[in-house]
Structure formats: C-alpha cells, structure tokens
Amino acid sequence: MLDRMPDAVAVHRLSRRIAAPCILASVLALLVFAGAAAGSPARSDATRAVPTIAGMDDAARWTAAYWIGRAPEADRPLATPDAIARQNARLLREDPSMHALAALGPELQGAQVRGWIEAVSRRPAAARFDASGRRLAPRSLDRLIDALALDTIPARQTTRYGLVVRRAALRTFPTDQRVFSTPGDTDIDRFQESALFPGTPVVIAHASRDGRWLFVVSQRYAAWIDTRDVAEGDAGTVLAYGARAPYRLVTGAAVHTAFTPEAPAVSAVQLDMGTRVPLAVAPAQGPLNGQHPASGHAVELPVRDGAGRLVLHPALLPRSADTADGPLPLTRRHLIGQAFKFLGERYGWGHDYNARDCSGFVSEVYASMGLVLPRNTGDQAGSPVLAVDRLGDAVRRDVAMGALEVGDLVYVPGHVMMVIGHADGEPFVIHDIHGGGQRGTGGDVVRLGLNGVVVTSLRGLVFDDGTPYVDRATAIVRPADVR
C-alpha cells in the first residue's frame, strides 16, 4: 500500500510492512476572487500563485512521447514473459510480505489469524481526529479493538475463500470512519490501508463482532473489507479464476464494463490497470445483458447472490476499452506510456479517492506488463527477490543516480519514484506524491503541494527541511532485472 508515513514525512513501521504513502501530486489552482467590504481583499491559499515546477517549463516534457523519444532501444524487451513468470513465482515463495493463498492449506490456525490481525489493527499510539476535528476518545478506540472479536478466533478453522466483486477499500479496523493525524487536515485517512480490485482472490480469515466486516488475506495485503464486497466460493473456483485463459488484461488507467440495467451487479464495474478478467466460458450467441456482444469482449465477473455466495456472471467489456489479451511487453516504451496514463490523477493514500498512492502507482504500471511488486514501498525496497541496490554513503548514491535507467524505482523514506529518462543532464521521474518541495530563487524551500501523479526532476525535489530527496535515497530497485 501506500506506505505509512507518520504524521509528517517520517516512516511508520507495521510489523513486516513499512507503510509510507507518497508525498506529491498535482494541484491546479482555483482562482476565486473574494469580494471586499473595505480595502484590498485578503488572499487565501487557493488564490496564491502556483509555483512553477523546476525543469518542466517545456510542455513537451509533460508527454510520454517526449520521454519515449529519448529512451534508448525503447522497444527492446527488458525481460521475457517466462523470466517474469519465474520471478513472480519466487516472489510469492520467498518474499515475507506476500501470501501464497493456495499454500495456506485446508485449515487456518488461530495463532496465525490473530497474528495477521494484530499486525494491522494496532491501537494508535498518536492522537487521531475525526472529520470534524474532534480527538478520538479512548472509549472510541476501545470499541474498535472490541470490534476485532479476537476472543472468537477458534484454535483452528476451515479455510474459506472468496472473490472481490468491486473495487473495495482495505481498512485498518472494521469501520469506514475516516480518521486523521491533524484536525482539519482530512486528506490522509489513517485507517485506510489499501484497496482490492474486482476478481482478486482472498482467504476469509475472520469476521468483525457485528459481521459487517471480514478480515481477508490477499496475495499482497491483509486487512478488513466490507462483507458486501466479497463473494464466498469454493477454493477451486476462486483460485482458478485469475489463471483462466483466454482473458483480458486492463492496460488503461481504468476501464468500465458496459452499463446494463438488465444486470446491475456487472454494470459499469470499474477495472483498474493490471486487473485480469477471464472471457466468458460460452460467449453469448444472442444479446448479452440487452446488448449485441459483437462490440465488446464477453467476460465473467464475480457477483454475490442473496446469500453472499459466489456467482460468475457475464458482462461486456467494450472493445474501445484499453485492454489487451495478455501482458504488454516489458519495454521502455510501455513503462513510460503506461505511467503517463495516470498523469494528473489525484493522490490517494492507500488507494483512497478512487485513485492510488506512490507504491500502488508503480505496482499497477508494472502489473500491466505482468510483473508483480509487493504492495508497500518498504516491502518493495526490502524484497529479497527483486534487484535492489541499497544505497550507503553519498559517493555511492551519486554513482547510482548517474546510472539510473528508465523504469528504475528510487526510494526515499515514505516514497517511491519511477525514472523516465534524462534531460539537461539530470534524471527525471514520474511519481504519485502528496506534497513535495523545491528551492526558490532565494534559496528558500517552496512547497509545491503536488498531490497527484506528476513529472519532476529528481535532484530538484527537497523535503520540508530543505534536504534534497537524493540525499535521503535509501534504495534503487530495477524490477526489469529479473532474477
């Protein structure tokens, strides 16, 4: 997920996972002229001039074509599909942040389930505030802990499986209440962990005391999900769904199934980049959900029946939607092109705001080429499987920065950026960030408030205290260097 940042720019560690969302994004200023009763009108934050992003005056640099044109051997595959598949399999076996659902067996042990929950659902040590700015009282936190129903976890239980039926939030606690670190600053919900997309297989490990929430384990994350967002099915059907062929892979930022009043459960369903959906077993010979099927791909989507059980229902995915019949080749052209499909999207901590954060952004870009990454920045940068260059002193960092290639992932505390090339002798990156700053003409720190997917110079970025991002770089991951 994100990657949990503490209340400012620091990194908060949760058991095996380092959460630390990203820190940047695009803010287009709204000019609002306030009427004045007497004298000059006061200028609010919304009416102040937006700083120019250093190195981005040339409009061409905001296009994928510019960077693709500068990329060496833009169409040369950087890894074969077989090599990528082998690395994905290794990641599932050897990376402790990943969960091999098929290997969990027919029974779950109570200690294992309790460990999963307690790794995520920890009582906050710092103050938390609700949307109105009121501090959460101890009794409110007590209720959240009680809702976990840890006392009801059996010593052993039959392993249950399900498929996610719609884009769904993963939560720290079984609640949809939004909580924040600072009164009035409601952009980052500290109870938001991540999100799962339709068709994601999960193991259903536990239920909240009121039954409205399920604790689920997916391949890349474990947390609480609304019960209504999961359809329970048998292990064979659930685990086979994502491996079925032929299929369509979403290669756009997001696509939607065709609107259909005849089948509301599969109408206008959002499918984000990297989502894989199998084609319908028996393509429709007549109308499909009230529409001729020739103009779309007939796919099968998971839905819940009245009892919450899994049913696979046909849906139409328009041929105009940005999808493919398999992963795109892992090339510099596609790395840049796929990343730019998110340009300008608002930053969303833990996939909030129907968007994504820094680690989610790079994960979805690589997923469109068939390559799996761990969910959080800490797990990505610390993976025992990926090609990771852990940076040390300044000399080593400078050497590494000079050797950056398209697709490399650069990590600083709480954030990850993807290299898209060089200009003016400097590396440039595309990233999904919440804040971000740079030096002004007088040497002072200028806060950019990027708050979305943007392109910036790597060396030009500074933290609030003026320290350059590159001086705090901790690791470089080259996902295309498959092992």
Can you name each region flagged by the protein language model?
Residues 22-32:
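Bacterial N-terminal signal peptides
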Residues 41-168, 217-249, 285-287, 291-336:
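Boundary regions of SH3-family modules and the immediately adjacent low-complexity/disordered segments
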Residues 195, 373-440:
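...with weaker cross-activation on analogous glycine-rich loops/strands in unrelated enzymes
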